[in-house]
Amino acid sequence: MEIERKFLPDLNSLPFNPEDYPCRKIEQGYLCTSPVVRIRRDNKSFFLTYKSKGLMVREEYNLPLTQEAYEHLKPKIDGRLIQKKRYVIPLDGGLALELDIFEDSLAPLVIAEIEFPDEESANAFMAPAWLGEDVTMSPLYHNSTLSKI
């Protein structure tokens, strides 16, 4: 189960420098968007992911892929290949902020995601102003939607 909230922060308003934190290079594409079936390269790891419908709460299953399988599936994606840098910033309460800085045609889009252990925690989270607009309930900011723009 994936329980997350999404925000649109302004990079100039962040109280930290993303470059001070670990960064992963992510490339992903969608074989299907309803339901979501995604392939992803995360640094040197490769995955096939299924995600159910939903906004804040969705079922998610990740299966490892070989690089060869990933490269075989990559030409079969619908829409654009998404490329982004992901910075992981620790937050209070054992939470982590995943800051995605999109590249190429989706630049300068920045999306911040925070995963929660349960819905109650997600709903109770008081977002600091620097996180910007809460777009959790907007399907427009799902990567599967962005792949079609």
Predicted features and spans:
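Phosphate-end processing signature that detects enzymes handling 5′-triphosphorylated RNA
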Residues: 1-149
